[in-house]
Curated annotation (Swiss-Prot):
Pfam families noted in UniProt: tRNA-synt_His (PF13393)
Gene3D superfamilies according to UniProt: Bira Bifunctional Protein, Domain 2
Keyword hit for Nucleotide-binding: no
Protein's name according to its UniProt entry: ATP phosphoribosyltransferase regulatory subunit
Entry keyword Cytoplasm: yes
Cellular component GO terms held in the UniProt record: cytoplasm
Protein localization: Cytoplasm
MF-aspect GO terms: histidine-tRNA ligase activity
One GO biological process term: histidyl-tRNA aminoacylation
Family: Belongs to the class-II aminoacyl-tRNA synthetase family. HisZ subfamily.
Role: Required for the first step of histidine biosynthesis. May allow the feedback regulation of ATP phosphoribosyltransferase activity by histidine.
Major localisation: cytoplasm
C-alpha cells in the first residue's frame, strides 16, 4: 500500500519551501515598511463565525466534527477570522490597526477533477478602523509595492465599487437579484437574456456589464446614468480615488463596476490584481472594503470600517517561475565536520557549535559515520558543501576546501 496525502492536500519539499519563503519574506518586508504587524488566527473556526452575515457560502467550508454539538470548519479565508479576533480580543485597541497575515486557507471544491487542490497559501493585510479616500489609496498602493518587491511589472488592477454595483442591482425584482448578480459576476449575457426581465431591466443589466474599461470612460458612462444622491456621492469618491492613484505615476488601473466578488461582505471598493504576462489572465489577489463585517462580531454590534487584500502565494509562484528569480536549489551547508576517530566525537560537536555560534548564519553538518574519507568527500560535493573540517583525536581541526 502506498500512503498518499489526503485528497486536495499536498506536501511541500525543501526546494518548494525555499521558493515559497522567498515570496513570503519579500512580502513581509513590504508589510513591515508600511507599519503592519503580523496576526495569527486559528485555522479552525466555529461555523457560526464563518457564516456570520451569510457572506461565505456554506458549501465552500470543509467542516469537521469535534464529538460535541459545535459545528466547526477550516477557515476558507482570513478576513472573518481576523475580524472576530480584533473585536473580541482587542477591545481596547487604538485605531487604525494595521495587521498582516501569512497563512493557509481551505476551500472545498466541487469540480469532478480528482485531487482538486483544497489547501491554499495567502499573504495579505487588513487595515481596520479607517474609512475613506486615504485608507483606500494606502491599500491599493501597498498592493503595487508588494508586486514591485517581487520584481513583477506586468500587471493591472481591476477596481470596482460594491456599493455602486449593489445599488444599481436594487432596481431588479428581489427574487431575481441573486441570479442577475451571479450573471453579472460571470459576465454571463446568455443568462441575462433568458431571465424574465423587462426590456428596460435587461438593458440595465447589459449596461452594468459594460461599465468596464479605462477609468475616464467608465466614470463618464456611470455619471450619465440616472443616479440618486447617494450613488452620485459614491461615484465622486471613486473618481477622487482614481485621481489620487494616478497623480504621480501611471497606476495600471481598469475600472469595472460589474466586478462582484463571490464572498459577499464588501461594501465599498473591490479589486482584483491580474497578471499580464500570460495568454490566460491569472488573478494574483483580491480585496476590498468591508465596513459592516466587524459589526457582526462586535458585542454591541458597533461597525468598524475595514479594508484589506489577500495575495495568492501559489499564483505568484507560477508567475515568478518564468522570471528565474526563485531559488533553484536549497541552501548548501557551509561545513561538514568529521570526527576522524571515536575519541574526537565530543570535540567535533564542540567545533561544529563554535561555527554555528558565529554572528553570521553558518550551516554546519556533522558526519554521522559509516563512510570512508572518499565517500565523505563525495557526499560533500553532491551537497555542494564548501568545506570539510576534519577533527583529529587531539581536538585540532584540519580544514579542507572543496572549491
Amino acid at each position: 500500500m502506498v500512503y498518499q496525502p489526503a485528497s486536495g492536500a499536498r506536501d511541500l519539499l525543501p526546494l518548494d519551501v525555499e521558493k515559497k519563503r522567498w515570496i513570503e519574506d519579500r512580502l513581509q518586508q513590504v508589510f513591515h515598511r508600511w507599519g503592519y504587524h503580523r496576526i495569527i488566527t486559528s485555522t479552525l473556526e466555529r461555523m457560526d463565525t464563518l457564516m456570520a452575515g451569510e457572506a461565505i457560502q456554506r458549501q465552500m467550508v470543509i467542516q469537521l466534527q469535534n464529538g460535541e454539538d459545535d459545528e466547526l470548519g477550516l477557515r476558507p479565508e482570513l478576513t472573518a477570522s481576523i475580524a472576530r479576533t480584533v473585536v473580541t480580543r482587542m477591545a481596547n485597541a487604538t485605531y487604525p490597526q494595521r495587521l498582516y497575515y501569512n497563512a493557509n486557507v481551505f476551500r472545498r471544491t466541487w469540480e469532478s477533477r480528482h485531487n482538486r487542490q483544497q489547501e491554499f497559501y495567502q499573504a495579505g493585510v487588513e487595515l481596520l478602523g479607517a474609512g475613506g479616500l486615504l485608507a483606500n489609496a494606502e491599500v491599493l498602493l501597498l498592493v503595487a509595492d508588494c508586486l514591485a518587491a517581487l520584481g513583477l511589472r506586468q500587471w493591472h488592477l481591476i477596481l470596482g465599487e460594491a456599493g455602486i454595483t449593489r445599488s444599481l442591482l436594487s432596481a431588479f425584482p428581489a427574487n431575481l437579484q441573486d441570479k442577475v448578480r451571479s450573471a453579472i459576476a460571470h459576465l454571463d449575457r446568455i443568462t441575462i437574456d433568458t431571465l424574465p426581465l423587462s426590456d428596460k431591466l435587461r438593458d440595465r443589466a447589459q449596461i452594468i456589464m459594460d461599465l468596464r474599461g479605462p477609468s475616464a470612460d467608465v466614470l463618464q458612462k456611470v455619471s450619465s446614468l440616472d443616479l440618486d444622491e447617494e450613488q452620485r456621492e459614491a461615484v465622486n469618491n471613486l473618481k477622487s480615488l482614481v485621481e489620487l492613484l494616478e497623480s504621480e505615476k501611471k497606476f495600471p488601473l481598469i475600472l469595472d463596476l460589474s466586478l462582484i466578488q463571490t464572498i459577499d461582505y464588501y461594501t465599498g471598493i473591490v479589486f482584483e490584481v491580474v497578471n499580464d504576462t500570460e495568454s490566460q489572465a491569472r488573478v494574483l489577489g483580491r480585496g476590498g472594503r468591508y465596513d459592516q463585517l466587524l459589526g457582526l462580531y462586535h458585542p454591541q454590534r458597533e461597525n468598524i470600517p475595514g479594508i484589506g487584500f489577500g495575495l495568492s502565494i501559489e499564483d505568484l509562484y507560477q508567475v515568478l517561475l518564468s522570471t528565474q528569480q526563485l531559488p533553484q536549489v536549497t541552501p548548501a551547508s557551509n561545513y561538514l565536520v568529521v570526527p576522524e576517530t571515536g575519541s574526537a566525537n565530543a570535540a567535533a560537536f564542540a567545533y561544529a557549535q563554535k561555527l554555528r555560534d558565529s554572528t553570521d548564519l553558518v550551516r554546519v553538518e556533522i558526519d554521522l559515520g559509516g563512510r570512508d574519507a572518499e565517500a565523505i568527500r563525495q557526499y560533500a560535493r553532491d551537497r555542494s558543501i564548501a568545506q570539510i573540517a576534519w577533527i583529529k583525536a587531539d581536538s585540532s581541526p584540519k580544514i579542507e576546501s572543496l572549491r
